Amino acid sequence: MSEKIVMALVVAIFGLTTIVGCGTAKIPQVGDKAPAFTLQSIEGKNISLSDFQGKIVLIVFTSVNCKECETQMPYLVGAYENAGGKLVVLDIYHMIYDPRLVQDYVTSKQFTTFPSLPDLNNTVANSYGATRYPPTNFIIDATGTIKYKKIGPFQSQQEIEDIIKSF
């Protein structure tokens, strides 16, 4: 092979590697700091993760047409109520359509115990690497560190409470 061809291949591979590497965001894992975010609730209030520093935060990435998400809702409510103010639950809804769908859904299902946050363009979900189906659940400790991640619904209230007690 001529030197020119080898040099062209090296430059092409380097350029492609650089382009691909620049477009890849790091998906946070257990032990990482939770990505910061601010979203507007269906009531119009801006809610930031940093608002809850010092508390345990359970973030649920969900969707208006996710049946598995609905099945875990009573477990979330029970764990929240038993935590005595030490636990915050945030329902973040994947959105690619009109955010009023979230309001209509939450109202019809009476899921009003904790903030419902439409995630327009899935910006926050993408920063966490969250899936649309099944739900993706993150538990963040009082220092803002991801302590637990689960893809799929919780199977019981006790499951949630045991995880929270473990840290």
Residue ranges and their predicted role:
Residues 47-70, 90:
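Short active-site neighborhood of thiol/selenol oxidoreductases, capturing the structured segment around
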Residues 33, 55, 132-134:
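Short, small/polar residue-rich loop motifs at catalytic or cofactor-binding pockets
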Residues 70-109, 120-126:
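Structural microenvironment flanking redox-active thiols in thiol-disulfide oxidoreductases
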Residues 22-49:
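N-terminal "domain-start" segment that seeds a small globular fold
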Residues 107-113, 120-164:
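Thiol/disulfide oxidoreductase modules built on the thioredoxin-like
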Residues 1-9:
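Bacterial N-terminal signal peptides that target proteins for export
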